């Protein structure tokens, strides 16, 4: 078998991604920075009435002290075109940017302003990169170790540190040479022809695509510590985390969505999170500058996502790059989270020294095991016994076992593609073994798979969408799957309703809490259940899940341009209860369902056929 893998592919990919102008800086979507130089412009606003300044702006921060409101407009993944509208105090402006032949063009257009409202163009060297900056009238020069970048601003108002211009008319900024507003506008319009447009490419799901593409594109940023482009869940999560934070299953799902039309970012994110693997052999719950959850992982979805990315793009180097780490992680689950053939979530104590972080609160405790589940405060785990000797929940977890079996099968297929026949067999056998144990969690009387208390041997009736995950791995037969849908999915006392699926059954005492994983709707749950439904002859359920997920996403996307972290299961609102970021990328999985339903994504239930 031919193997052209060199081991340099990932570095070469990042070298291509991390260059040129874009909104690379985490702290503000109004900052435009050139890589690798690190020279950039931070656009700020001054309120003419109060003299207050908006120094940083992020999408979805209406409830923060600064209270800016941003409508995220079209944006290419590489930042060659960006557009947004910003409202703050009495200022309402549109900001457009374009990059052509590595030159930056910015156009700031007032929509509604008052007298003395101003734009401040503040140049700087980002991330402590070396360079000298000088300002002369309406021009800025950035002398870096790579090149000298010249910027020109229409209008006057120079100070020693920045350029302040009135917003009573449009402001044009260009690099390379001075240009008029009309010339910059011409460049903007030229670049605008390259923006992703759901209406032309994804005609059956245009706004689902636009929501997904924009939340991914606007949350793509630069990690200066590791010199990489990544797509974290939300900039709002990253700012207090030191500039970036990666969560395990969130990042894999982002990579899956990105694989639709940005192969490079899909690869980059799948590699980034997988390469955060710990010395113990698991991909951690979360990682950020100086912090990594060394006690716990998160729901395993990595091999499945990598398999699907490969199915879309057929480049084996990605499989070679990630296979060994995915295999270590796969074996880690069986070696460290198995209790009598069942899998349960846990947390491994370790000495984290004198440096304290809030995520350390759960180490070696039930809280940490709940965090490993990814369902932090789910009522499923309220009354679970936590074994302080092995540091695991004493609960056979239907959702975890299903996801793990799916990982075993996915990684087995990848092993087959790579010609690793012994490992392929190992993984196939492991999947079969856990599938047999999962079958024992079927409750014939109740018509659903149920978590089981491993102390008492009793089933738990705290019902969550995770109990439908066995559909993912075809453990139920058609009759069982039909019962699951009829008796539980379509049961209005449990999961059915105008908005679905609540993270705990509607008749559960915790449903009324409407707080995080206690009743609210989460896109990854819908997505995983939808993938499972596709494995069966359940056409109505498949259609209903796609349609209701679409309607839920579009309820807040149309008009608000928000993609929420989670949603109210009664009203479909995303911002009614706190703890729901307004621009969180996995919320777009609600739209990815519809995009997949219309055939724009390779069918995940079909096996890999390329074994050459």
Feature-to-residue mapping (PLM):
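C-terminal capping/lid segments that line or modulate ligand- or cofactor-binding pockets
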Residues: 2-41, 45, 298-313, 443-488, ...
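Exposed alpha-helical structural elements
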Residues: 183-190, 207-215, 318, 479-484, ...
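Generic detection of long, well-ordered alpha-helical segments
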Residues: 181, 185, 202, 206, ...
């Amino acid at each position: 078998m031919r193997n052209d893998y060199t081991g340099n592919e990932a570095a070469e990919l990042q070298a291509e991604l991390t260059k040129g102008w874009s909104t690379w800086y985490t702290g503000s979507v109004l900052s435009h920075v050139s890589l690798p130089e690190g020279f950039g412009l931070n656009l700020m606003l001054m309120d003419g009435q109060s003299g207050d300044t908006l120094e940083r702006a992020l999408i979805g921060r209406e409830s923060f002290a600064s209270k800016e409101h941003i409508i995220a407009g079209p944006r290419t993944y590489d930042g060659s075109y960006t557009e947004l509208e910003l409202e703050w105090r009495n200022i309402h402006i549109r900001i457009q940017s374009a990059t052509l032949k590595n030159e930056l063009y910015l156009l700031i257009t007032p929509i509604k302003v008052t007298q003395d409202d101003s734009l401040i163009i503040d140049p700087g060297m980002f991330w402590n990169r070396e360079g000298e900056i000088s300002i002369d009238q309406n021009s800025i020069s950035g002398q870096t170790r790579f090149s000298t970048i010249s910027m020109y601003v229409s209008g006057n108002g120079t100070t020693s540190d920045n350029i302040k211009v009135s917003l009573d008319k449009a402001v044009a900024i260009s690099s390379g040479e001075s240009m008029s507003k009309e010339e910059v506008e011409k460049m903007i319009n030229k670049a605008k022809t390259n923006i992703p447009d759901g209406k032309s490419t994804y005609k059956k799901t245009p706004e689902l695509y636009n929501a997904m593409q924009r939340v991914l594109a606007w949350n793509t940023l630069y990690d200066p510590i590791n010199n990489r482009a990544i797509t974290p869940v939300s900039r709002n999560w990253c700012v207090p985390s030191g500039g970036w934070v990666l969560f395990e299953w969130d990042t894999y799902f982002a990579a899956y969505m990105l694989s639709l039309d940005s192969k490079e970012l899909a690869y980059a994110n799948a590699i980034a999170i997988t390469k955060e693997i710990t010395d113990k052999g698991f991909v951690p719950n979360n990682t950020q500058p100086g912090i990594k959850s060394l006690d716990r992982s998160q729901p395993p979805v990595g091999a499945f996502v990598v398999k699907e990315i490969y199915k879309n793009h057929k480049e084996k180097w990605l499989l070679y790059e990630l296979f060994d780490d995915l295999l270590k992680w796969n074996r880690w689950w069986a070696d460290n989270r198995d209790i009598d053939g069942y899998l349960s979530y846990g947390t491994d104590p370790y000495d984290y020294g004198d440096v304290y972080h809030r995520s350390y609160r759960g180490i070696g405790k039930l809280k940490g095991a709940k965090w490993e589940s990814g369902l932090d405060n789910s009522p499923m785990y309220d009354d679970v016994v936590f074994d302080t000797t092995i540091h695991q929940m004493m609960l056979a977890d239907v959702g975890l076992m299903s996801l793990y079996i799916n990982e075993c099968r996915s990684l087995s297929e990848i092993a087959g593609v790579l010609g690793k026949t012994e490992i392929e067999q190992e993984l196939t056998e492991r999947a079969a073994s856990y599938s047999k144990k999962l079958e024992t969690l079927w409750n014939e009387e109740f018509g659903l798979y149920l978590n089981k208390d491993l102390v008492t041997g009793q089933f738990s009736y705290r019902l969550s969408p995770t109990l439908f995950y066995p559909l993912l791995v075809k453990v139920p037969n058609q009759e069982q799957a039909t019962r699951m849908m009829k008796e539980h999915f379509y049961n209005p006392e449990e999961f059915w309703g105008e908005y679905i699926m609540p993270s705990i059954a509607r008749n559960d005492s915790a449903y009324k809490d409407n707080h995080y994983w206690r009743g609210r709707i989460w896109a990854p749950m819908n997505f995983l259940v939808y993938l499972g439904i596709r494995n069966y002859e359940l056409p109505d359920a498949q259609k209903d899940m796609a349609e209701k997920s679409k309607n839920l996403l579009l309820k807040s996307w149309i008009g608000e341009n928000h993609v929420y972290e989670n949603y109210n299961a009664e009203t479909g609102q995303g911002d009614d209860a706190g703890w729901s970021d307004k621009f969180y990328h996995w919320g777009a999985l609600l739209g990815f369902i519809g995009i997949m339903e219309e055939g724009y994504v390779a069918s995940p239930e079909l096996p890999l056929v390329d074994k050459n």
